[in-house]
């Protein structure tokens, strides 16, 4: 279901006029999210033609003058990631050549973020390559949400604003008034994320699932570090891809005596067989955001989808007005 519980902000982005020269455009990957962001900002999405030629090449044309404007292009690089990334690059290039004063690539989900380093010889660091492409296309700034690896910010030599979906998720969890919460990291690498999450939930205790990955998209869960018996376990991650890690973690938590298990993640990648794993009865709820569009065929009764449109809209407005973004997350 799409929950009405969203991150509540005191809207500063009201009464936009032509004099502000702020323009908002959407790629094809998540038009609904872009429309919600535009609604928060009290403006319309800019007109743009997007089409595909017979040979598969993409074409983009901005349908209004943006000369001297502060332009924001919303395009999560989700499946099909290569098409959506290429479309973003073309949009950025089109705006630069149209003499926009500043072009900001708003990337709610940054594709290729898991390829942030070499883990074996003769591999590409694709996250860095994507950063180079976006910069060379002409972007002046990037706004992204919940990067898989925070150090990706350092791959850019242009301003990079990194925002978090946790306020939206926390607002919803708080509204449920859950008791005896323990926040669980599905692996050692996510401990910092889970610890920050737990601190916002009245310093809830922390547990860690110790696992060792045998191959890509395959994880072997070994044991739980921490006490989860009789508690409401909240598994926290940045994304759910095939669901193998988080489902195996939930199964182990149940075996260790957890009373309830919730899953929270910003990005719902949901590659097969994620839906099958997540809807198998292991979770009370699977709570995600709408950074990536979720088709009806991938929805199931335990799924809760929260909107990050207000958060993104407020961030865009603050960038445009040169005001603080970090104060939103204190």
Swiss-Prot record:
Give the residues the record marks as binding D-ribose 5-phosphate: 213, 237, 241-245
A GO biological process held by the record: ribonucleoside monophosphate biosynthetic process
- Which cofactors are reported in the record for this sequence? Mg(2+)
Q: Please list the GO terms describing molecular function.
A: ATP binding; kinase activity; magnesium ion binding; ribose phosphate diphosphokinase activity
Reaction(s) catalysed by this chain, per the record, are: D-ribose 5-phosphate + ATP = 5-phospho-alpha-D-ribose 1-diphosphate + AMP + H(+)
- Please give the Pfam families that the UniProt record associates with this protein: Pribosyl_synth, Pribosyltran_N
Taxonomy, superkingdom:
Bacteria
User: What are the catalytic residues?
Assistant: 211
Q: How is the cofactor bound?
A: Binds 2 Mg(2+) ions per subunit.
Family membership noted in the UniProt record = Belongs to the ribose-phosphate pyrophosphokinase family. Class I subfamily.
| Oligomer status and interactors | Homohexamer.
Q: Which PANTHER family match?
A: RIBOSE-PHOSPHATE DIPHOSPHOKINASE FAMILY MEMBER (PTHR10210), RIBOSE-PHOSPHATE PYROPHOSPHOKINASE 1, CHLOROPLASTIC (PTHR10210:SF41)
Q: What is this protein called?
A: Ribose-phosphate pyrophosphokinase
Q: What's the source species for this entry?
A: Nostoc sp. (strain PCC 7120 / SAG 25.82 / UTEX 2576)
């Amino acid at each position: 279901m799409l929950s009405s519980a969203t991150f509540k902000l005191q809207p500063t982005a009201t009464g936009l006029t032509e004099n502000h020269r702020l323009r908002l455009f959407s790629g094809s990957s998540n038009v609904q999210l872009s429309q919600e962001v535009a609604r928060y900002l009290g403006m319309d999405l800019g007109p743009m033609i997007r089409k595909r030629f017979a040979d598969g090449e993409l074409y983009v044309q901005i349908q209004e003058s943006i000369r001297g404007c502060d332009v924001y292009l919303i395009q999560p690089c989700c499946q099909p990631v290569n098409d959506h990334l290429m479309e973003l690059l073309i949009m950025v290039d089109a705006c630069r050549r149209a003499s926009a004063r500043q072009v900001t690539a708003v990337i709610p989900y940054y594709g290729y973020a898991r390829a942030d380093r070499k883990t074996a010889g003769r591999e590409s660091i694709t996250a860095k390559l994507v950063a180079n492409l976006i910069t060379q296309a002409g972007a002046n700034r990037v706004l992204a949400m919940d990067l898989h690896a925070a150090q990706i910010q350092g791959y850019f030599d242009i301003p990079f604003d990194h925002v978090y979906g946790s306020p939206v998720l926390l607002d919803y969890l708080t509204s449920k008034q859950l008791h005896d919460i323990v926040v669980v990291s599905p692996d050692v690498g996510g401990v910092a994320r889970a610890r920050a999450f737990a601190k916002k939930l009245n310093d809830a205790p922390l547990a860690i699932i110790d696992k060792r990955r045998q191959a890509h998209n395959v994880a072997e869960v070994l044991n739980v570090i921490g006490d989860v018996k009789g508690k409401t376990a909240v598994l926290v991650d940045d994304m759910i891809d095939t669901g193998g890690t988080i489902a195996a973690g939930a199964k182990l938590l149940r075996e260790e005596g957890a009373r309830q298990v919730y899953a929270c993640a910003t990005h719902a990648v949901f590659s097969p067989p994620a839906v099958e794993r997540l809807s198998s009865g292991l979770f009370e709820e699977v709570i995600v955001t709408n950074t990536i569009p979720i088709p009806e065929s991938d929805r199931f009764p335990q799924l809760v989808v929260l909107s990050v449109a207000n958060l993104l809209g407020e961030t865009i407005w603050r960038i445009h007005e040169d005001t603080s973004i970090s104060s939103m997350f204190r």
